[in-house]
Amino acid sequence: MSQVAPKWYQSEDVPAPKQTRKTARPQKLRASLVPGTVLILLAGRFRGKRVVYLKNLEDNTLLVSGPFKVNGVPLRRVNARYVIATSTKVNVSGVDVSKFNVEYFAREKSSKSKKSEAEFFNESQPKKEIKAERVADQKSVDAALLSEIKKTPLLKQYLAASFSLKNGDRPHLLKF
C-alpha cells in the first residue's frame, strides 16, 4: 500500500522543535570538597561561619555541622556553590552519618485550616519545637567531632571565629 497524500498542505512551514540531548547526571563536586574539610559558608543565616563538611547528600547538597557546641551551626544541608573550602581538615571517620539523608531534613506538612479574621490579626507565630531525636543526633555528631577537634591546637577557636573580609583584602589572592 502506498503513502496517501495529505488532503491539504500548510501555507507556511512549521519548524520542528530542536531535539535536546541533555540528560540529568549527578553533580560533580569540586576536588577540594572531601569529607572532613573545614568550609566557610558564604550565604544564608550562618554566613561567615566555619563548619565541618561531613558528607554529600543525594540532592547534591553538602551535610555540614558547626559543631553546634562550638559555633552554633546545627546539622544542615548547604549548596556547594555557597561554600569556600579551606586547607584545614578534620578526621571524620569516627562520625556516624549514615542515618542522614534528604528525608531526614524534609519539612513536616502543616495542616492548613481556615482562620477567622480575629485569629489572623492577633496570631503570634508559635516557637518551632525541635524534635528530641534531632537534638540527640546533633549531640552524638558533636561529641565525635569535638574529640577530633581537640587533638589539633587552636582548631576549636578557629571554628568559633567567623570569617569576614577587611578593607584591602583581596579574596582572589587569599590562601584558604
Swiss-Prot record:
Record's keyword terms, sorted? Cytoplasm, Ribonucleoprotein, Ribosomal protein
- Record InterPro entries: 60S_ribosomal_eL6, Rib_uL2_dom2, Ribosomal_eL6_CS, Ribosomal_eL6_KOW, Translation_prot_SH3-like_sf
Q: Where is this region: Disordered?
A: 1-27
- Tagged with keyword Isomerase: no
Query: Does the keyword field hold Nuclease?
Result: no
Q: Where in the cell is it found?
A: Cytoplasm
Q: What is its main location?
A: cytoplasm
Gene Ontology cellular component annotations, sorted alphabetically: cell surface; cytosolic large ribosomal subunit; membrane; preribosome
Q: Which GO terms describe its molecular function?
A: RNA binding; structural constituent of ribosome
Which Pfam family would be a valid example here?
Answer: Ribosomal_L6e
- Any Gene Ontology biological process: filamentous growth of a population of unicellular organisms in response to biotic stimulus
UniProt signal peptide: none
Q: What is the protein's known function?
A: Component of the ribosome, a large ribonucleoprotein complex responsible for the synthesis of proteins in the cell. The small ribosomal subunit (SSU) binds messenger RNAs (mRNAs) and translates the encoded message by selecting cognate aminoacyl-transfer RNA (tRNA) molecules. The large subunit (LSU) contains the ribosomal catalytic site termed the peptidyl transferase center (PTC), which catalyzes the formation of peptide bonds, thereby polymerizing the amino acids delivered by tRNAs into a polypeptide chain.
Q: Which PANTHER family match?
A: 60S RIBOSOMAL PROTEIN L6 (PTHR10715), LARGE RIBOSOMAL SUBUNIT PROTEIN EL6 (PTHR10715:SF0)
User: Subunit structure of this entry?
Assistant: Component of the large ribosomal subunit. Mature ribosomes consist of a small (40S) and a large (60S) subunit. The 40S subunit contains about 32 different proteins and 1 molecule of RNA (18S). The 60S subunit contains 45 different proteins and 3 molecules of RNA (25S, 5.8S and 5S).
What is this protein's name?
Answer: Large ribosomal subunit protein eL6
To which species is this protein native? Candida albicans (strain SC5314 / ATCC MYA-2876)
